From Swiss-Prot:
GO MF term set: ATP binding; ATP hydrolysis activity; DNA binding
Record note on domains: Consists of an N-terminal domain, which is sufficient for the localization to the septal ring and is required for cell division, followed by a linker domain, and a C-terminal domain, which forms the translocation motor involved in chromosome segregation. The C-terminal domain can be further subdivided into alpha, beta and gamma subdomains. The alpha and beta subdomains form the DNA pump, and the gamma subdomain is a regulatory subdomain.
Domain FtsK stretches: 464-660
Protein known as: DNA translocase FtsK
Organism: Streptococcus pyogenes serotype M1
InterPro entries, A to Z: AAA+_ATPase (IPR003593), FtsK/SpoIIIE/SftA (IPR050206), FtsK_alpha (IPR041027), FtsK_dom (IPR002543), Ftsk_gamma (IPR018541), P-loop_NTPase (IPR027417), WH-like_DNA-bd_sf (IPR036388), WH_DNA-bd_sf (IPR036390)
Family the UniProt entry places it in: Belongs to the FtsK/SpoIIIE/SftA family.
Gene expressing this chain: ftsK
Amino acid sequence: MVKRNQRKKSAPKKRLTKAEVEKQRAIKRMILSVLMALLLIFAMLRLGVFGVTTYNMIRFLVGSLAYPFMFAWLIYLFCFKWLRQKDGMIAGVVIAFLGLLVEWHAFLFAMPRMLDQDIFLGTARLITRDLLALRVTEFVGGGMLGALLYKPIAFLFSNIGSYFIGFLFILLGLFLMTPWDIYDVSHFVKEAVDKLAVAYQENKEKRFIKREEHRLQAEKEALEKQAQEEEKRLAELTVDPETGEIVEDSQSQVSYDLAEDMTKEPEILAYDSHLKDDETSLFDQEDLAYAHEEIGAYDSLSALASSEDEMDMDEPVEVDFTPKTHLLYKLPTIDLFAPDKPKNQSKEKNLVRKNIKVLEDTFQSFGIDVKVERAEIGPSVTKYEIKPAVGVRVNRISNLADDLALALAAKDVRIEAPIPGKSLIGIEVPNSEIATVSFRELWEQSDANPENLLEVPLGKAVNGNARSFNLARMPHLLVAGSTGSGKSVAVNGIISSILMKARPDQVKFMMIDPKMVELSVYNDIPHLLIPVVTNPRKASKALQKVVDEMENRYELFSKIGVRNIAGYNTKVEEFNASSEQKQIPLPLIVVIVDELADLMMVASKEVEDAIIRLGQKARAAGIHMILATQRPSVDVISGLIKANVPSRMAFAVSSGTDSRTILDENGAEKLLGRGDMLFKPIDENHPVRLQGSFISDDDVERIVNFIKDQTEADYDDAFDPGEVSDNDPGFSGNGGAAEGDPLFEEAKALVLETQKASASMIQRRLSVGFNRATRLMDELEEAGVIGPAEGTKPRKVLQTN
């Protein structure tokens, strides 16, 4: 009885609550997930025999899609709850994966080696081969599951049709995974089709307009050709000097001596070939001996001059002494350039109102009382002009550049304190979008004088006004900036501007392009003195040829009694107006070096000497330089070069040191690139910020082809640098002297005299670059004059005088 009561008293097991049951299930699920994840990781990494075998077993099921399958399984294990909350996500993934299995198996049985194989047996044979050999080498399509799906689909729709079925499965799966409904998809497709239709219609209209432009251009060229033929026919007609009537060549009976010459090609005459003894000229024979002896054909104007006395004309006859090859030369028109696209800066206006408030609040937080007077929206930056209160020091505002950039969320802020000519301080903040300034837009808005051949539009200031500069007043220009900052585009814009104004007989170019790609497009234009120089060794000699030309011109000016090229050309015009013998004016010469750093590495002394001499004297001789470099360091832009090239154009650089090398002040390190520049001409103390014009390669090619179609290049052999070799004195590939340096004996004598040897001493005493000085030190060591380098200790001199 007692035992029965004890049995009754033993309480049954405590039933778990629902929360505890769920917790145990979650723990079991987590343990299983971790074990399964470890299994999958071993299989994915194929670790040992177990990993390879497990991987091949999964390949047996899903084939070569084993990796995506295992990765999706891992995501499912740890994101189960999240996936359950997404309606259709799991179903979409499964359906899309089945479509991929069909695609993979269709690709497998499209291979030639599987065409006559049974689908199940062929697939199993491939997988079993890898499974037994413990390797993974064969492409097995979608595995046995893929074979199971592919066989009925291929039977019903063929192998090609199975691709479409698999693709439909994938689309259906993606559709289930995304929150789109059928209406959204149809609406999206309809909008895309409408946009394509509109784009097609616009493209069709553009093609029609382009065809019409080509047709009109062809008609224009035909009319111009007809007019040229008419001018040529009229030029060949003979005028009777007594009656002034036009007569046929066969009926012409002119009795004076020069009548026969009227029907022949004009003869190339030197200045003094037919001067009479009693004629008084403005020049002596020796004075113009330097002038080009072969200057091309001239119009035969002697008949006109002879008939002047017979016709008793009191008024002087105006003569044209332009070479015949350039009489019909037409300057390029602005229509050759692509039209500029409209710019929308409405966002900037809204941003300016906000920034004005931010600026005033920021200054107020630092205890500085200022007021924003005005804001000017430029192409690349917006300039806020602020007026500080009385007693506020300017440097307090200048020191807040970084704080202002932080407050305005700007890339960088440049402070101009103060603005030249104003009692205001300028704060330049980059725009959210840079508005491109096209060359055509700048040319049309520029007020440059067309009579000034070297006055070219350069860019737009912050206030939107076009700015021009006259290279003749510069008189030389240094262009420097990092790679991709817009330096080469600016040089192309300057060249194109000059080509738009000047005939080949008015301006000549010498272009030096060691990079071989920037200026080569200008080859064969008649404005070139010689082809574009791409060899750095030849460039040094070419610059020396320009120096020789400068000296020759000064000798000519001295004999004539004029001070500059303008005075000389005026004398030529007066002489040609009063004499039958015609002389051609001297053209302006523009020397363009696109990469100065490369030249300084090859022949620094020769290049620097030539640049310095041209910088000191070439202005009056009508010779101007444009020097461009992407490495604005002091070993490239030396102090003497800076002193003789006073006008500077700085693009974006990496540091304030480079900015000071170019402009002698900071600022260029805060530029934005893409044509954003600081321009400091010779007549201004502070640089001006401009957005340079953009000229595309297509625009340059069009203007070059327009010029080439009119006339051919006529190079001047006097400027040809000739051939160079590795043994030329003063050159070497590493920037020093070649073997057998001509300064070796001088360096040896210097070392023996001072009993000291250092590269810096040779640099100072022999005026050579560092690379050449170190090369001389190596040669002195090889000759046994000095000992080897001993760290920081000076070298020992082994010989005595």
